Amino acid sequence: IHPKAEYHKRAYVTKKFVSDFNERTGNTVQYLEAPYEPNEYRKLVRGLEEEPEGGDRCKVCFDYRLDKTAQVAMDLGFDYFGSALTISPHKNSQTINSIGIDVQKIYTTHYLPSDFKKNQGYKRSVEMCEEYDIYRQCYCGCVYAAQAQNIDLVQVKKDATAFLLDKDVEKDYSHIKFTVTKLDI
C-alpha cells in the first residue's frame, strides 16, 4: 500500500474495526499485520507498471499476497487461508480464487474460495462501513493503479498523516493483536 502513511492509516482503521466488532458481538477476532515491504512488491511487478487494472500486475500482486498469507497460515497451523479481495467490484473473484487454489498446492493449508461481492455482499460491506464508521479508500493501494486513476498521492499522504497525528499505531488496540502460543504435545 502506497504511501506508507496510507498503509498505517488502513492498518489502524482495521484494528479499530476488529476491536469495535468484538465489543459489539462478543467475538474474539484477532489482528495479524503483514510487514510493510513496498520494495519487494516493486521488484515483483517491474515491467508491469503500465498494465491495466485487472491485468498481469494485479495477478502478480494476488499471487504474492496469497502466497504470504498461506505461509503464515501454515506456520500458525491454520487449516485454511483466504482473501477479502473478492468483496471489491473491481477485482475478479475467479482470478483470485484460481491463484489461491494454485498457491495451496505448495502448502499444508487449504485455500477457501470466495466471492464476497455476491448475494449483496458488496452492498453489505458498504452498510457495515457506515455502521462501524470505517474509512473506505478510493484505490487498492497500488501506486501504479493510483497513478492510472489520477489519484493525488501527495494529498493521500497528507490526509493519512493528519489522521495518524493523534494515534499511537503500536499501542492503540494492542489487545486484539494476534499472539502465537505453541503447545508442546
Describe these PLM feature segments.
Residues 1-185:
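Nucleotide-activated chemistry modules centered on ATP-dependent adenylation/adenylyltransferase
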